[in-house]
Swiss-Prot record:
PANTHER family: POLYNUCLEOTIDYL TRANSFERASE, RIBONUCLEASE H-LIKE SUPERFAMILY PROTEIN. Its EC number is 3.1.-.-. InterPro entries: RNaseH-like_sf, YqgF, YqgF/RNaseH-like_dom, YqgF/RNaseH-like_dom_sf. It comes from Helicobacter pylori (strain ATCC 700392 / 26695). This is Putative pre-16S rRNA nuclease. It comes from the Bacteria.
Length: 134
């Protein structure tokens, strides 16, 4: 199974590829990086993930890239890790919330649903890249 994550300072959005369908999963709320890396490690083990797709911004965001790379090194995972450009994934995910009212949009941001929709976009990009190369 393939899992994607959108690593943020407060939340980690999660999406999975199940039988060819990309689905958002419940986001991991970050209290600190050790707790978040343990939670992600547990999820990867529970779901028997073989490939972890991680969103990274454009290389001009050096601090953010270093933070994401450091966090991923804390994750206990022996499978394949693939980094995919995440530029505009959060904006595209937010556009998917257009049907919600203001209050529900704010809640979707706070509870991590937006982050998991962003992880869906990252996973879509990975799938497009893999299909293009085959």
């Amino acid at each position: 199974m393939i899992l994607a994550c959108d690593v943020g300072l407060k939340r980690i959005g999660i999406a999975a590829l199940l039988n060819g369908v990309i689905l958002p999963l419940e986001a991991i709320l970050r209290h600190n990086r050790n707790q978040a890396s343990r939670d992600l490690s547990d999820l990867l083990r529970e779901k028997n993930i073989q490939v972890l797709v991680v969103g990274k911004p454009h290389e001009s965001y050096a601090d953010t890239n270093a933070r994401i790379e450091h966090f991923i090194k804390l994750v206990d995972f022996k499978g394949e890790i693939v980094f995919i450009n995440e530029d505009r994934s959060s904006i595209e995910a937010y556009e998917n919330l257009e049907h919600l009212g203001k209050k529900n949009k704010r809640l979707a941001i706070k509870d991590g649903r937006l982050d998991s929709l962003s992880a869906c976009r990252i996973l879509e990009r990975y799938c497009q890249k893999v299909l293009k190369n085959h």
